Structure formats: structure tokens, C-alpha cells
Amino acid sequence: MLLFLLSALVLLTQPLGYLEAEMKTYSHRTMPSACTLVMCSSVESGLPGRDGRDGREGPRGEKGDPGLPGAAGQAGMPGQAGPVGPKGDNGSVGEPGPKGDTGPSGPPGPPGVPGPAGREGPLGKQGNIGPQGKPGPKGEAGPKGEVGAPGMQGSAGARGLAGPKGERGVPGERGVPGNTGAAGSAGAMGPQGSPGARGPPGLKGDKGIPGDKGAKGESGLPDVASLRQQVEALQGQVQHLQAAFSQYKKVELFPNGQSVGEKIFKTAGFVKPFTEAQLLCTQAGGQLASPRSAAENAALQQLVVAKNEAAFLSMTDSKTEGKFTYPTGESLVYSNWAPGEPNDDGGSEDCVEIFTNGKWNDRACGEKRLVVCEF
């Protein structure tokens, strides 16, 4: 109320001309209502004053602080699906799942075609000796066996009676020179020789003086006794040499040799193809082992067992397939083939090997086997 009275007082104090000019100015304006500029009121309160003019625009103020963010609008409608992107990298392998239950067994398939026979494997180690079996029934008498190996030389027996003169033997090898013996007594005079060719007649000589009568000659019996003593001494030396040779042969054969009858099997322990093995034995003065009896085969088997290696034999069927012969070309007089052998597996088995069990098998000559020479 007080503000209203102050406004009326200001209007009354203004000059009349000024008021009229102001009224004219405002009369030209479009007035929506008669009470727009002058508020209508009762007579008691007086007229309100006019609005003042707008002042000049002041300088721009500093930028105010940002207002609080408005409330988020509602989510818009989803846009159209974009194009398919490139394939991503494979992810890491996941952990294996639990093992599934065993499915039912399927029906048995048809039997496959038998594969080709594999190559014979290496020789296995000799098995342990099995338990002794029960004695079987007594068999029939077998054929007479071969002559066994010569036994050890026995001790010298008592001197027997002189036997009849034997046939002249084959000259023996030259023995070791013995010590020089004592000079023997002069032998009996031999028979007179046949007269020589007649020489030219010589000059007649003077008659000589008769010589003294010679001494009586010794009897021939002591000469026979002396010869007998010499023969006995030579026999003792021969026996000594034979014993020494037998002992030397045993030492030489141990442990890589075997003697049976007049044969000696010897190995140096190395393995070679057949051709090289054959050449080595030939250069040493022998040939590859050629067992011609069960005894010789058993002696050779001992060397094979000691070395635990199969060994080549000298026989081949390179000339006629299936017909094995010795190096001399003669047919076999003894054989000890394993069951089902020889079978010429692969069409290239022309040589023979002996296993640790003493059985024979045909084998390719290019394979390497133990070298055993025969002397």
C-alpha cells in the first residue's frame, strides 16, 4: 500500500506538459486495454505511475556454472540390425567333458585278409632247462652209431713181442731237431760193392810189403741191441711230443674253438656276410664250417651257444634251387633242418645258418652271421 501511495505522489509532482506529451506518445501504441498502463483503482488511492524505460543492455556477465543434468529421457526404439561382422578368433579350448558311458558293442566285423608273413625275428636267448620228464618206454635198438672221437692217449704199456714187419707208412712231417747224440760204435762192414768200370791200365808198381794181420771183428748182435735202444728213445720222444701237442691244442682251442675227430672249428667272434666269411676262412687255410655228422654239428653248436649268434655254414643252393651242396659240389651227407625249412622265403635264401639249438635254416647270403672256420 505504501508503494502505491509513493507512485501516485511522483505523478502529481510532474509538470503537466510532460504528462501530456507522454500520454500522446502512448496513445499511438496499440493498447489492448485501458488499464494496461494505468491501473484502475478507487479515487482514494490515486493513479499508479507508468512503467519506466528499459535501461541499456549491460555488459555480458561471466558464464555461470553448468546446471544440474536433466533427467534421462526414455530409451529410443532399437535401430535396424547392422551387417554381419567378420568371424572372431577361436576361443580357448574348453575343459574336456566327463567320460561318456560305454556304448553297446557293435556286431563283429568280417575277418581280414591274412597279412604276409613277417621276417624272422632275432634269435632269442636260450631258455632254461626244463624239468626232467618221466622216462619213456624202452625203444628199439637203433642203428650202429658213427665212430666216436679218439680218446685221450693212454699211458705206455709193457713192451710186447716184436710183431711182423708192417708196410711202409706215409712219410711223417719233419720233427723238431733233437740234441746231438753220442757217437755210436762203428758198424759192421757192408757187402762188397759191384766192380766199377775198368780204368785205363796204369804203370806197373813195385811189389809192396805184406801187411800185418788185422784184429778180429765184433759180433753183429751188439749192433742190434744198440739200434733197439735208439728206437725206444725215439718212441719216448714221440710220446712226449704228442702229449705236448695235445696240451697245446687244448689251450689254442679255448674258448673259441672245438675239436671233433680230425676237424677243428674256430671262430674269431665277428660277423660278416657269406661271401666275406668264406673268403676269410679260405685265406686262413680252411673253409666255412661244414658239419657232416651229428657229432660235428654238436661241436659247432657249442661255439654258437657260447657267442649267442647264429653262424653261416658252407653249403648253398645257388646253382640249383632247393639242392644244397658243399663247396666241392657234392650233395649233403648230413642235415639238421628246422621244421618247415628250407623254405626259400622271399626267393633269395640261398645260404644256410645254424641256430643256437643246432637246427639249420636257409638264409639270404647278404645277411651278417657269425664266422666259424673249419680246419
From Swiss-Prot:
PROSITE patterns: C_TYPE_LECTIN_1 (PS00615), C_TYPE_LECTIN_2 (PS50041). GO terms for cellular component: clathrin-coated endocytic vesicle; collagen trimer; endocytic vesicle; endoplasmic reticulum membrane; extracellular region; extracellular space; lysosome; multivesicular body. The modification 4-hydroxyproline is found at residues 78, 96, 171, 177. One of its GO terms (biological process) is macrophage chemotaxis. Residues 105-114 have a biased composition (Pro residues). CDD domains: CLECT_collectin_like (cd03591). Residues 66-86, 116-132, 138-150 have a biased composition (Low complexity). Residues 260-375 form the C-type lectin domain. The N-terminus is blocked. Hydroxylation on proline residues within the sequence motif, GXPG, is most likely to be 4-hydroxy as this fits the requirement for 4-hydroxylation in vertebrates. Expressed in lung, brain, pancreas and adipose tissue (mainly mature adipocytes). The modification 5-hydroxylysine is found at residues 87, 99. Pulmonary surfactant consists of 90% lipid and 10% protein. There are 4 surfactant-associated proteins: 2 collagenous, carbohydrate-binding glycoproteins (SP-A and SP-D) and 2 small hydrophobic proteins (SP-B and SP-C). Contributes to the lung's defense against inhaled microorganisms, organic antigens and toxins. Interacts with compounds such as bacterial lipopolysaccharides, oligosaccharides and fatty acids and modulates leukocyte action in immune response. May participate in the extracellular reorganization or turnover of pulmonary surfactant. Binds strongly maltose residues and to a lesser extent other alpha-glucosyl moieties. This is Pulmonary surfactant-associated protein D.
